[in-house]
Amino acid sequence: MNIHEYQAKHILSKFGVNVPKGVVVHSLGEVDGALSQLNSKVVVVKAQIHAGGRGKAGGVVVSRTLDETKTSIKNMLGSTLITHQTSKDGQKVRKVYLEEGCNIKKEYYISAIVNRKQGQVSIIFSTEGGVDIEEVAATSPEKVIVCNINPVFGFQGFHGRNLCFDSNLSLDQTRKISDIAGKIYKAVLSTDANQIEINPLVETSSGEFIALDAKINFDDNALYRHPDIQELRDYDEEIKEEIEASKHGLSYIKMDGNIGCMVNGAGLAMATMDIIKYYGAEPANFLDVGGGASQKTVTEAFKIILADDKVNGILVNIFGGIMRCDIIANGIIAAIQEIGINVPLVVRLSGTNFELGKKLLDDSNLNIITANDLSEAAYNIVNIVRK
């Protein structure tokens, strides 16, 4: 689960990380009251969406007068921001964050992530802040320092010193950055976050370190332990199909293509998307119905896929292990009879009782095209949609 910048900063402040003072605004009518709470002539107006790259898209504006601030807010509210992290349709701005400006001396990058490969939390630090850390890692990998924290001992002072050792930082700077690293490490563990990122972490002209931007992503599976964090969820920022899918235990991710996919198993789902791309088309979604799909689950999966207007065809790829293919076939037939499908449908079944499942589909007198293998199925749906 993602949250907004202002929410992330509020959480970080609870762990002792310095953040600029700011106020959330939903309309122009709230501006005067919001500005009265700030003690700076320079105000930064920030669009609040669940995506990075806002600055390059016009979603972060520095204003120095009341008129500039109001103009920036007016231009942002209700607009659609398209960044490298949004879909091509972008995301609508429903709220902005007004924040006190500060005198920036230097920008840094720091984050704490759950490193599943290492089985530890990793702290990542760079003196090159304010830009994508991926770019820095690609062009100047020596400037990205990664420190893995053994969970038995937790974050120690030497971890902070290791982060700053080759960065030509003073003892005071090292001490302050180490302190922040320890705080975000504690925040990750305490909130069950997958990642906490501060970019940029700025050093001001007075030597203070402030989180100028912050992002936090939480582990959905641990949210039941944090009802206060669950309340921060902004459903307006999430894709409605993904929300609906989660209600039915489906793993769904919307994509930009036109061929809908229904598959059981994440690995098989990714392979299905790959082969669709191999034949020259683009998948409209990732959808894993899981190993215990029922008729109701299949029906809901079809509804979610068809809610995307871009879908011109559907490929169902099921491997029957524990789940029998004849049960899946009956579920597909019942789902089609219930909701109707007006786009081409290709189904590939393999595994337990796949012959019976294929016969049920062929004898159903419904507009279902069966395939013997995944390659044939992908080739058929791609070519049918192209016609």
Swiss-Prot record:
Mg(2+) binds at residues 199, 213. The keyword Ligase applies. ATP binds at residues 46, 53-55, 99, 102, 107. Pathway: Carbohydrate metabolism; tricarboxylic acid cycle; succinate from succinyl-CoA (ligase route): step 1/1. Residues 9-244 form the ATP-grasp domain. Substrate binds at residues 264, 321-323. Its EC number is 6.2.1.5. GO terms for molecular function: ATP binding; magnesium ion binding; succinate-CoA ligase (ADP-forming) activity; succinate-CoA ligase (GDP-forming) activity. One of its GO terms (biological process) is tricarboxylic acid cycle. The keyword Ligase applies. It holds the Pfam family Ligase_CoA. GO terms for cellular component: cytosol; succinate-CoA ligase complex. Its cofactor is Mg(2+). It is an enzyme of class 6 (ligase). Binds 1 Mg(2+) ion per subunit. It catalyses: succinate + ATP + CoA = succinyl-CoA + ADP + phosphate; GTP + succinate + CoA = succinyl-CoA + GDP + phosphate. Heterotetramer of two alpha and two beta subunits. Belongs to the succinate/malate CoA ligase beta subunit family. Succinyl-CoA synthetase functions in the citric acid cycle (TCA), coupling the hydrolysis of succinyl-CoA to the synthesis of either ATP or GTP and thus represents the only step of substrate-level phosphorylation in the TCA. The beta subunit provides nucleotide specificity of the enzyme and binds the substrate succinate, while the binding sites for coenzyme A and phosphate are found in the alpha subunit. HAMAP family: Succ_CoA_beta (MF_00558). This is Succinate--CoA ligase [ADP-forming] subunit beta. It comes from Ehrlichia chaffeensis (strain ATCC CRL-10679 / Arkansas). The lineage of its organism: Bacteria, Pseudomonadati, Pseudomonadota, Alphaproteobacteria, Rickettsiales. The gene is sucC.
